[in-house]
């Protein structure tokens, strides 16, 4: 549903955007729980080259292969139509990508993402930051965890990672596990 008056009234029409493979429950080996929770944001800076764009980011699990992926779609017409979903990360059958979060830098419209990348053949897990300077037309990604960690399938990590950005200062936050102990981390990213 949509509103043209800042939420005072809503149209009666609902629109299904995409089939959500895996839905809320995504099975990633060695993680107690993961989810495909969609993240929805808008670029609300009138000076941004992408002003008014709506962005959607979520994770899926392929029912046949069990592979997970982080997807992205955008609308440039107030949600009337949406781009076909694309992967934020490089295509790779050797990794699962999951537990994503996204933000838009209100000062310039740059998009930033954080998500886990876990080997499909081992417990080895890293944290990845991805960014887009062109409204999601393309993405750059970088592993930001200083070293890989190995999760335990018996310990609950939480349901979310998070990321904030303003004036090209980007701060993702995530939990990791070392020797059975969960700690919270961030990266100090100054984006140019």
Give each language-model segment a name.
Residues 1-192:
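Extracellular, repeat-based ectodomains that mediate carbohydrate processing or recognition
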């Amino acid at each position: 549903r949509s509103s043209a008056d800042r939420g005072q009234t809503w149209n009666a029409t609902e629109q299904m955007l995409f089939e959500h493979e895996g839905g809320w429950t995504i099975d990633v080996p060695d993680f107690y729980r993961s989810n495909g929770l969609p993240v929805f944001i808008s670029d609300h800076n009138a000076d941004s080259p992408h002003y008014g764009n709506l962005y959607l980011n979520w994770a899926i699990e392929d029912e046949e292969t069990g592979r997970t992926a982080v997807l992205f779609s955008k609308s440039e017409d107030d949600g009337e139509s949406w781009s076909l979903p694309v992967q934020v990360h490089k295509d790779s059958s050797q990794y699962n990508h999951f537990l994503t979060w996204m933000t838009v830098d209100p000062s310039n419209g740059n998009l930033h993402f954080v998500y886990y990348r876990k080997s499909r053949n081992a417990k080895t897990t890293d944290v990845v930051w991805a960014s887009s300077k062109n409204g999601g037309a393309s993405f750059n990604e970088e592993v930001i965890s200083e070293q890989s960690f190995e999760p335990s399938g018996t310990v609950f990590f939480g349901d979310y990672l998070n990321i904030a950005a303003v004036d090209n200062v980007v701060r993702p936050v995530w939990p990791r596990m070392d020797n059975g102990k969960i700690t919270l981390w961030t990266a100090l990213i100054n984006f140019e």
